[in-house]
């Protein structure tokens, strides 16, 4: 069983809400540098930025990061990850952790946790994290992905819908969470086995993945086991909007 792992940080220049997001300044550094620095504090043996944009390549080289230039036609971050794993020549059982390029506050311990979980669960080809849902607003928010696991910690399904739907309890009232139902929010950090990444992209999207816009459903569709654990530390939300950017700037410039 290998416990060593590589972090890959997919980073795209294009963004509908925040064009050039990876290079936006936060406390004197581009956002991608903050993400790379946090990932470098983890136990990863290697941290690599993956991008299709020459401007991001140059910025990463300037602060000393290893960077791989990828194709521009990838449909998803996982497709980009698979290309990088192949270019790096990673062994099929090597562990790769995907850290999003817009999470400058990600705790290094979270990266270590998801990698260690996959290493410890040889029956799984993916691992990810979750945290408890504590209010009905979050539960009914379609932008929050819910996850249900079996008694062994393996994912049964993910959905943007209310999952599971407590039929009887919600028939009476929807302003409080039903007792005894462990609602959980999926946290979008993944560890993969490198060989699995090549299988994943070869399958192509399935209708369920397309319906929910959730890539991990492609893995479940093909019978892949995904280990899910509660995060030891809940990571702060990433930077998706101008408001998020200002919030992170205030935290890092304080």
Swiss-Prot record:
Q: What is its EC number?
A: 2.7.7.38
Q: Which cysteines are joined by disulfide bonds?
A: none
Q: What class of enzyme is it?
A: transferase
Q: Where in the cell is it found?
A: Cytoplasm
Catalytic activity entry: 3-deoxy-alpha-D-manno-oct-2-ulosonate + CTP = CMP-3-deoxy-beta-D-manno-octulosonate + diphosphate
Give the record's pathway: Nucleotide-sugar biosynthesis; CMP-3-deoxy-D-manno-octulosonate biosynthesis; CMP-3-deoxy-D-manno-octulosonate from 3-deoxy-D-manno-octulosonate and CTP: step 1/1; Bacterial outer membrane biogenesis; lipopolysaccharide biosynthesis
The UniProt entry lists the main location of this chain as cytoplasm
What Pfam family is a match, any one?
CTP_transf_3
| Annotated Gene Ontology cellular component terms | cytosol
Entry keywords, A to Z: Cytoplasm, Lipopolysaccharide biosynthesis, Nucleotidyltransferase, Transferase
- Molecular function via GO: 3-deoxy-manno-octulosonate cytidylyltransferase activity
Q: Which GO terms describe its biological process?
A: CMP-keto-3-deoxy-D-manno-octulosonic acid biosynthetic process; lipopolysaccharide biosynthetic process
| Record-linked InterPro entries | Cytidylyl_trans, KdsB, Nucleotide-diphossugar_trans
Q: Which family does it belong to?
A: Belongs to the KdsB family.
Q: What does this protein do?
A: Activates KDO (a required 8-carbon sugar) for incorporation into bacterial lipopolysaccharide in Gram-negative bacteria.
Report the protein name in the record.
Answer: 3-deoxy-manno-octulosonate cytidylyltransferase
Its lineage opens with:
Bacteria, Pseudomonadati, Pseudomonadota, Gammaproteobacteria, Pseudomonadales
The gene coding this protein: kdsB
């Amino acid at each position: 069983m290998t416990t060593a792992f590589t972090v890959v940080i997919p980073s795209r220049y294009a963004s509908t809400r925040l064009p050039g997001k990876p290079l936006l300044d936060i406390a004197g550094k581009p956002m991608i540098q903050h993400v790379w620095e946090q990932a470098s504090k983890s136990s990863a043996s290697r941290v690599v930025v993956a991008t299709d944009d020459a401007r991001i390549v140059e910025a990463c080289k300037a602060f000393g990061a290893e960077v791989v230039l990828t194709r521009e036609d990838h449909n998803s971050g996982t497709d980009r990850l698979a290309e990088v794993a192949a270019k790096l020549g990673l062994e099929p059982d090597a562990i790769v952790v995907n850290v999003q390029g817009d999470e400058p506050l990600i705790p290094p311990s979270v990266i270590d946790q998801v990698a260690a979980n996959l290493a410890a669960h040889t029956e799984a080809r993916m691992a990810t994290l979750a945290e408890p849902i504590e209010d009905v607003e979050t539960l009914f928010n379609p932008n929050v992905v819910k996850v249900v696991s079996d008694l062994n910690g393996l994912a049964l399904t993910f959905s943007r819908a209310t999952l599971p739907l407590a039929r009887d309890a919600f028939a009476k009232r929807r302003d409080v969470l039903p007792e005894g139902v462990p609602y959980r929010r999926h946290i979008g950090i993944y560890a993969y086995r490198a060989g699995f990444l090549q299988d994943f992209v070869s399958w192509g999207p399935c209708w369920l993945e397309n319906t929910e816009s959730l890539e991990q459903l492609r893995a479940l569709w093909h019978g892949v086991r995904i280990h899910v654990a509660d995060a030891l530390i809940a990571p702060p939300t990433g930077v998706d909007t101008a408001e998020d950017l200002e919030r992170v700037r205030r935290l890092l410039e304080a």
